């Protein structure tokens, strides 16, 4: 047995019988050290020394490794009222220190159930606070269903995106965001794919399959998807902040204007060392189907210095936190979900 990802039972989830997935995850936990035994007197006779083979030592190591494995049960189910606070926590990983009403956004996500999935710890008859902790969230949310009567949190999301794009994105990306906001046709969705940092990626195929199944059944099909990814860029290359996928480097020498600086940053970032917090996010840029544009912006000023989401060190190199705003068409999004369904990314 290991971690089990399944549907929650009981009255809390009675309406969710269609969402059943099961798989096993194993996570290693540090075992508490036992007091070291008193040293035994050394024997002066070689006859008392027991010869231990390498195979026996390996077997002992394997036995100890098995003892260090702990089992945790997790459940994947449609968002409900009990998950509200946990969903807010997941959303704050995407939107750092913003004026967006996360609670209203969480309530909107819950109202779309049974669309979407949250990952929570399984519980039996006795419930604890940990039973209501959300470990992951995967869903979509229409960004432009009703232009005139959009909820405030939707307007705040567009304000956030436009402000970030104005500082560092090419003009066409800024205009694209404006066009999405003005359309009001419900054909643009926000893809939310959040998990606790370093949560096993074995959950991805089931999460993506659930989203793909739901989206394929929507009456109003998404034509455009907005996705905000979490990533880190190697220190020394953060000057590429605000860089984009959509422009070529300038050929002109001498003093550069704002547009040319953005092009230069875009060209430099193509060779930057990047670590994605969600490993599956890298796949999106390896696909050939459909189209996407993106730009990156730094968020280190929005993260507490001691936070696990701040700068990390890997192989002696520091990586600083960024966000990547991706705008993709339905073909790229569908291919991304399909790829995520087919394989586990590590």
UniProtKB/Swiss-Prot annotation:
Acidic residues: bias regions: 37-83
Compositionally biased spans, kind Basic and acidic residues: 11-25
Region (Disordered): 1-83, 238-260
Domain of life, per lineage: Eukaryota
One GO CC term, this protein: nucleus
Amino acid composition bias (Low complexity), ranges on this chain: 239-248
InterPro entries associated with the record: BCP1_family
Positions with biased composition (Basic residues): 1-10
Family recorded in the similarity comment: Belongs to the BCP1 family.
PANTHER family, A to Z: BRCA2 AND CDKN1A INTERACTING PROTEIN (PTHR13261), BRCA2 AND CDKN1A-INTERACTING PROTEIN (PTHR13261:SF0)
Protein name according to UniProt: Protein BCCIP homolog
Taxonomic lineage from the root: Eukaryota, Metazoa, Ecdysozoa, Nematoda, Chromadorea
